[in-house]
Amino acid sequence: MDLVNLCSKLKKGTVYLKDDYEDIVLRMEIIDNSTHCFIKRRGRKEVEVDSKEKDVFESKMDGNEISKEEYDEFR
């Protein structure tokens, strides 16, 4: 997803992405004017990660938007 589109969607609410290459899903939201990023890997619990990390940035760029339901069902 391109950065302009991602930023626009984040201003409206939580954004969910799936990166098929890394086999992870991301949940991003703005809390107190700061972007918080959470990832979930198969078989693991959701964890908060630094949204500026290189791998997270690549997943944001390469990921496809998914629904909250798809995010919740990812295991």
Question: Model segments located where?
Answer:
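Acidic, low-complexity, intrinsically disordered interaction modules
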Residues: Y21, V25-M61
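Negatively charged, low-complexity tracts enriched in Asp/Glu with abundant Ser/Thr
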Residues: M1-K18
